[in-house]
């Protein structure tokens, strides 16, 4: 359920919630190549919001971790000791295939998105004694809405 909700959240961040409010898409300076300068420009474009979370496609996460700026001795020591990778400009980085290849989604987690739920988590059980079958269904009704459109942006390496 949590993976499906995360995928829905990424979709709403990228495409909007049906109110003509998709995230602004910015392109890197050189198509197909992400640079530290691109990350700084992306971070700088969030004023008055704070870029505190990024959702990176697996290829972009690897590109960020392979940047010389992300491979200094202290960052490497922390990564090897704790397993926590250094993050771009202090933002919490989530690697997910829910983001399209070549895409980095940046957001202010306090202002970009809200989860709207109808009821809670519902668990139902069913038993057929004569056939020795037992099954369970777990459902949740939820959706996402954007709070402030400018609190999320997309950086793409595509031309």
Q: What function would you assign to each model-found segment?
A:
Residues 1-46, 154-159:
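Alpha-helical scaffold segments that mediate packing/assembly in large oligomeric complexes
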Residues 2, 6, 44-48, 66-70, ...:
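Generic surface-pattern signal
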Residues 20-26, 59-63, 102-107, 122-124:
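A generic short-segment signal for beta-strand/edge and adjacent turn/coil regions
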Residues 27-34, 40-91:
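A contiguous, surface-oriented mixed alpha/beta subdomain in the mid-to-C-terminal portion of proteins
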Residues 68-159:
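Sequence/fold signature of self-assembling virion shell proteins
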């Amino acid at each position: 359920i949590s993976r499906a909700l995360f995928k829905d959240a990424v979709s709403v961040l990228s495409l909007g919630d049906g109110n003509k409010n998709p995230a602004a898409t910015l392109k890197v300076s050189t198509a197909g190549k992400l640079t530290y300068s691109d990350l700084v420009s992306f971070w700088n474009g969030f004023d008055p919001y704070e870029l505190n979370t990024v959702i990176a496609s697996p290829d972009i996460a690897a590109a960020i971790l392979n940047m010389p700026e992300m491979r200094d001795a202290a960052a490497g020591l922390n990564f090897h000791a704790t397993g926590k990778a250094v993050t771009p400009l202090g933002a919490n980085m989530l690697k997910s295939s829910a983001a399209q290849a070549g895409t980095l989604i940046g957001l202010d987690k306090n202002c970009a998105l809200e989860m709207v739920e109808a009821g809670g988590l519902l668990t139902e059980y069913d038993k057929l004694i004569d056939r020795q079958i037992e099954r369970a269904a777990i459902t949740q009704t939820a959706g996402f809405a954007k709070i402030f459109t400018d609190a999320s942006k997309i950086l793409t390496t595509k031309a």
